[in-house]
Amino acid sequence: MIKNRLINFFSKKEITAPIRNKMMMNWSNEKNFYNQRKTKEKLRLKEGRPHTVFYFHSLSDPYSHLTIQVIKKLISHFNIVLEIFFISQPSENFTPERKMYRKHCLKDSKEIAPFYGLKFEAEEFYLKENENLAYKILDYFSDMDQGDYIDLIFKVSSLLWDNDKAGLTSIISELSNDESELLNKKITDINIEGDKKIQSLEYYFSASFHYEGENYWGIDRLGYLEDRLIELGLKKNNSDKNIVKKLEKSKFDPSQIIEKDDPLILEFFPSLNSPYTYISFKRVKELIDRYPIKLLTKPVLPMLMRNMKIPTHKGKYILSDSAREGRKHGSIIKDIYSPIGSPANRAYSLFPIIDSYGSGFRYLEELTKASFFHGINIGNEEFLEELSNDLGLPWDKIRVKLDTDNWRSILEKNLKDMYSGNSWGVPSFKLTNFDNSNPYYQWGQDRIWLIENEIIDRLSSRR
């Protein structure tokens, strides 16, 4: 019974707010993070196990097509054992708005690939009929040398995304003496073992790595795995630290800004219950300080207040990963008080009037800091009064809007705008020219660098 309640504990009332907040703090706590590493390493030594990294791949995942291109580098640079598993795509509880998610993965993978020196050029998803043949090939040749098998996975994946059925068939002719045996072989579900394995490790996404208690998703988090392996002394040589480096664009020279130039418009879509939103504020502010940008802050309701579910495994990963990212970017997650429900509603009710004073961004920034660093109930009226005063605002005029409902239609309008850019989660971003033309959307704090790249491109084109 308890287990069933925990499946979607974020949205269940059976588990009280204090218990939920404590669990969230345990998952994001830095001391717990490093203690787990020490415990896992002691256990590994005691059991005499090698340094084993698990890699989870799905042919239908564009991000997996990126990660398979770096696997051989990982093996050649580190003294590790790599085990490869194929897995199914997670349920809709883990990936709400599935159609939007699939479209996003395709677009995002194609957009980031060149910056990592990788290839992915598919404009659309492959024909489903070719997937079974692809998995038959990978299942049939799974006993070959691992390096050759990794090459085969990449080749099969490339042909699949190119919808090249003839190319897939030619692989069989090249590698098998009995083509009919492979084609007629009744394939077992190649994903069964991988699905069980990844569930046992409390994770759900493909294109991911797992090493001794920690999950690392895709190219974006591979650096964390490398750092950990380096700390354990597993680097084989003194080659460059990162096996995959992101190409950085040169920063735009502020001296080139012409005073009469119209600023770009950046719309920022945050929510109050998102740790990823909290750790993004600092970098968004840096963009505003660095470039001629007009910022529009457009909050939306948290996913849980939009009747979406967050399974426990996902919640745990979100907290641990956002804390890890926060430490990297200088936005520490410490004490947590989740504002879901009444606290968020009360805080949102003041946003329209506070934003009319030009303080909407700072207000939401301080609210998320209160929730994810100070552990404060942001629905407390004394706190809201103190925050209003800190922002230099007249509390007597602000407080009359507390617990009113006019904010709901504003947030609903913001949500529709965010969805129009194929973004359903936060933080999301929309960059336009000053006349609102040429909208460019990005979802997630992971892609703030792409927003900056687009800003640089647009400003540079004016020179």
Q: Model regions: which residues?
A:
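Soluble or luminal CAZymes and related metallo-dependent hydrolases
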Residues: 101-105, 186-190, 276, 314-318, ...
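Conserved strand-turn element in the central/C-terminal portion of the radical SAM core barrel
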Residues: 58-60, 125-128, 267-273, 337-341, ...
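Short, charged/polar micro-motifs that form catalytic or ligand-binding hotspots
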Residues: 57-61, 99, 215, 271, ...
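Short boundary motifs at domain starts and secondary-structure transition points
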Residues: 41-48, 253-261
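Structural alpha/beta surface segment adjacent to cysteine/selenocysteine redox centers
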Residues: 59, 65-160, 279-371, 462
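C-terminal cap of thioredoxin/glutaredoxin-like
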Residues: 2-6, 10, 19-25, 33, ...
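Short active-site neighborhood of thiol/selenol oxidoreductases, capturing the structured segment around
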Residues: 47-63, 77, 81-82, 260-275
